[in-house]
């Protein structure tokens, strides 16, 4: 009897935990990609350009291990009012070893373990808290269908999947009201913090500048059959501290607020879709369009009067029973972003046709080309350009373009056409082309 009595508290705790689990069912979602690859000179080389996979496509052009784990649960539901708690952690690494952690280590050491001069103190893996927020419905009498939210979250992100290119994404810590029915569409408003730091766009200043983004969107506007429109405005408020205003750094003192306007037309085609996007921005948003940004960072240091625009067309369209095609066209411009800059242009073309042999077996080709041009105020200009060609054989859980999990074997050829700004991109700066071979898995759920 004593033994039975000893286990009673444990049994009660387990029972309570199971009951709690039943009462608050947990939603489990995630994403990952990982694999192995080599190039003609060591491990895979993907540095054709800055933002290379966004410019020439991601297939056979990703050398990392990346994952997201999302857990969420509706913790309250009564009288039409609900509260949902959402969370997500993410990790990234280069996949070079079995044990990859955040433990700091030196890349090279002497015999006694002392770091040698010029060696980098490095971590194998990086972990990040991507989402932690509360979403509540039914609380607003004037809009019971709307969601009141606060915390850190992915916020209405717009992207091109084949290049992993996010072009409208102010995700971060903030608050807002989402999905207010207004006529044929829905209105959303958010306030999100997007500080300018040295991790954005290679900016070299260590002292972060506070930037707050106000976002207003009107989505789901019906136009014609299978056609809809979404429009939005983002207002970035540069908020330097008193110390930054008094510093000798003019980029802090002279930081200006900026506006980004976005319009996205979506057209359904043959069971697929095509999107055309027009964006215009002032001040720091000029750098967003020149350097493949999405609105989640603001180039507050841009010269007073800078502006820019971007045109995007992308989609995935079925072509008969056996073929599907994904594509991307991008043209972006930034004007007068710094003292010697007159105009920066960037353009990209990516196409990914896919042939389905059966419900689980497909062959994929992806080709991409890009060009960057920097024109200076003295009339001179520099250009970088290059391309990628990838052939892959894939096995996936279904025949759709979007079917995942997927395992793919690939071969990629990357080459530079022009290298006036970057120089040789491969083989430690000695070559302008390379081959990559590898195997990759990708899944979302």
Swiss-Prot record:
Top-level taxon in the UniProt lineage: Bacteria
Membrane topology listed for this record: Multi-pass membrane protein
InterPro entries: G_neg_Bact_CarbUptk_Porin, Maltoporin, Porin_LamB, Porin_LamB_sf
GO cellular component, one term: cell outer membrane
Stimuli inducing this protein: By maltose.
Signal peptide extent: 1-25
Main location: membrane
Subcellular compartments: Cell outer membrane
Residues carrying the site annotation Greasy slide, important in sugar transport: 31, 66, 99, 273, 402, 444
CDD domains: Maltoporin-like
Described purpose of this protein according to its UniProt entry: Involved in the transport of maltose and maltodextrins.
HAMAP family the UniProt entry points to: LamB
Record's protein name: Maltoporin 2
Source species: Aeromonas salmonicida (strain A449)
């Amino acid at each position: 009897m004593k033994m039975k009595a000893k286990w009673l508290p444990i049994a009660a705790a387990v029972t309570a935990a199971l009951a709690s689990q039943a009462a608050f069912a947990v939603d489990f979602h995630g994403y990952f990609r990982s694999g192995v690859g080599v190039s003609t000179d060591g491990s895979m080389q993907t540095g054709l350009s800055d933002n290379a996979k966004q410019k020439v496509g991601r297939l056979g052009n990703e050398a990392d291990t990346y994952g997201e784990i999302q857990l969420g649960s509706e913790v309250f539901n009564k009288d039409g009012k609900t509260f949902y708690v959402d969370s997500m952690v993410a990790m990234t690494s280069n996949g070079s070893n079995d044990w990859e952690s955040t433990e700091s280590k030196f890349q090279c050491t002497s015999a006694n373990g002392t770091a040698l001069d010029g060696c980098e103190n490095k971590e194998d893996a990086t972990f990040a808290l991507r989402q932690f927020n509360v979403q509540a419905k039914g609380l607003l009498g004037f809009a019971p269908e709307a969601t009141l939210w606060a915390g850190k979250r992915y916020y209405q992100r717009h992207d091109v999947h084949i290049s992993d290119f996010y072009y409208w994404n102010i995700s971060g810590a903030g608050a807002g009201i989402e999905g207010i029915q207004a006529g044929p569409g829905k209105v959303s408003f958010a306030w999100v913090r997007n500080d300018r730091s040295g991790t954005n766009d290679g900016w070299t200043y260590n002292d972060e500048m506070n930037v707050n983004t106000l976002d207003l969107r009107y989505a789901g506007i019906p136009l014609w059959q299978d056609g809809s429109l979404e429009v939005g405005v983002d207002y970035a408020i540069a908020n330097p501290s008193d110390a930054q205003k008094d510093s000798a750094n003019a980029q802090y003192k002279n930081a200006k607020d900026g506006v980004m306007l976005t319009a996205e037309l979506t057209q359904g085609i043959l069971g697929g879709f095509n999107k055309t996007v027009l964006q215009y921005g002032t001040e720091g948003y000029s750098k967003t369009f020149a350097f493949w940004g999405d609105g989640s960072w603001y180039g507050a240091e841009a010269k007073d009067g800078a502006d820019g625009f971007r045109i995007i067309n992308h989609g995935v369209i079925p072509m008969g029973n056996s073929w599907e095609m994904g594509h991307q066209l991008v043209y972006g411009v930034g004007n007068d972003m710094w003292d010697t800059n007159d105009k920066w242009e960037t353009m990209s073309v990516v196409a990914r046709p896919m042939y389905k042999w059966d419900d689980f077996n497909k062959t994929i080709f992806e080709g991409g080309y890009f060009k960057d041009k920097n024109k200076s105020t003295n009339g001179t200009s520099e250009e970088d350009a290059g391309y990628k060609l990838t052939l892959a054989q894939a096995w996936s859980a279904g025949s759709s373009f979007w079917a995942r999990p997927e395992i793919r074997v690939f071969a990629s050829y990357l080459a530079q056409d022009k290298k006036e700004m970057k120089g040789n991109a491969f083989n430690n700066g000695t070559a302008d082309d390379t081959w990559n071979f590898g195997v990759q898995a990708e899944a979302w759920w």
